[in-house]
Amino acid sequence: MKAVLVALNAKYIHSNLGVYCLYAYSRKKGISSDELVYREFTINQEMDDILGALYKEKPDLIGFSCYIWNIEEIKEMACELHKILPDTAIWFGGPEVSYDAGKVLEQNPYLSGVFVGEGEVSFYEVLRYYQKKEANQVLLPKKEEWAKKEQTEQTNDQKKSNAQKNDSIKTLEQIEGIAYRKQSGKEDTEAQKFIKSSDNASEKTEIIITKARPCMSLDDVVFPYHDMKDLKNRIVYYETSRGCPYGCSYCLSSVEKNVRFRSMELVKKELQFFLDQKVPQVKFVDRTFNCNEKHTMEIWQYIKEHDNGI
């Protein structure tokens, strides 16, 4: 089982905090570096080059991080990927698709699913679902022989590890915070009342939108930069809070009212990491950075007192 997270950045110096956080959370939960990787590209690269690089990965699952500046390129890329990797599950996530996941699935038939809202836990559980699917050989026909071969080659330690991982894996309809295309012949239970039928009657497809996932504590978000190299040549994105208390009609951030803050103890420790690594530019991506004066001033004070002149 192999999954690839894909970031399509505006420029090389930019980075993708969303992809980093999903990767770091799943790795901390026990997913190995052989099972999950992330790849970063830019919208200025030739699409054929990106497609070639992703094709070489031969992933079972591929997830794209979707924003306003890359959504059209990602749709085109994902459509082409489906042609050359028809057995690969393709999932979208990010602010450009999260707010209307059912419609995104209806309009893009090559998609397997869309993550709705925060993705750390949902992505991990979806990844575990696909691991179980492979272990049980509940696969698309073209992969059955390959799966049998892989299973027979596993060592006893690998089998034991997989058994432990599969103990509490959920089915898709039990995973909160996702939308997915219903497989024919499969009966849904908890998610049944969230079904949306496709407008295209000839396709006879149904979209399942599961229950919203409760917001996680920001202290449970894994700091993604500890093991990363070459931070001196990139713009680093960092968040100390999520959510927005305001209701601006033009902004997607107004959808999530639950403002949460990362504990100041963690924030200071992570700011010190950036200072020690001599990162030249850190951009705070909090929706409303100054909505809590005490929180904001503590951050400024720490930076002022520990300035390293970079």
Across the structure, where does each feature detected by a protein language model lie?
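Radical SAM [4Fe-4S] cluster-binding motif and immediate context
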Residues: 202, 219-310
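A short, charged/proline- and glycine-enriched loop
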Residues: 1-2, 234
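Short, glycine/serine-rich, charged loops/turns that create anion-binding
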Residues: 10, 97, 288-289
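Nucleotide-activated donor-dependent transferases that construct or modify glycoconjugates
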Residues: 2-11
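Alpha-helical scaffolding segments of alpha/beta enzyme cores, especially the outer helices
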Residues: 21, 76-83, 125, 269, ...
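Short N-terminal binding/cap micro-motifs at the start of the first secondary-structure element
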Residues: 12-18
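Glycine-rich beta-alpha loop elements in corrinoid/cobalamin-binding modules
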Residues: 25, 34-211
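Short catalytic helix/loop segments, enriched in acidic residues and glycine
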Residues: 19-27
